[in-house]
Curated annotation (Swiss-Prot):
Contains one covalently linked bilin chromophore. Belongs to the phycobiliprotein family. The gene is cpcA. Disulfide bonds: none annotated. This is C-phycocyanin alpha subunit. Keywords: Antenna complex, Bile pigment, Chromophore, Electron transport, Membrane, Photosynthesis, Phycobilisome, Thylakoid, Transport. The keyword rRNA-binding does not apply. Light-harvesting photosynthetic bile pigment-protein from the phycobiliprotein complex (phycobilisome, PBS). Phycocyanin is the major phycobiliprotein in the PBS rod. GO terms for cellular component: phycobilisome; plasma membrane-derived thylakoid membrane. The keyword Membrane applies.
Length: 16
């Protein structure tokens, strides 16, 4: 299960 924190990091990392 992904945590909201992990989701935020992944989203920011995708944006570069």
């Amino acid at each position: 299960v992904k945590t909201p924190i992990t989701e935020a990091i992944a989203a920011a990392d995708t944006q570069g």
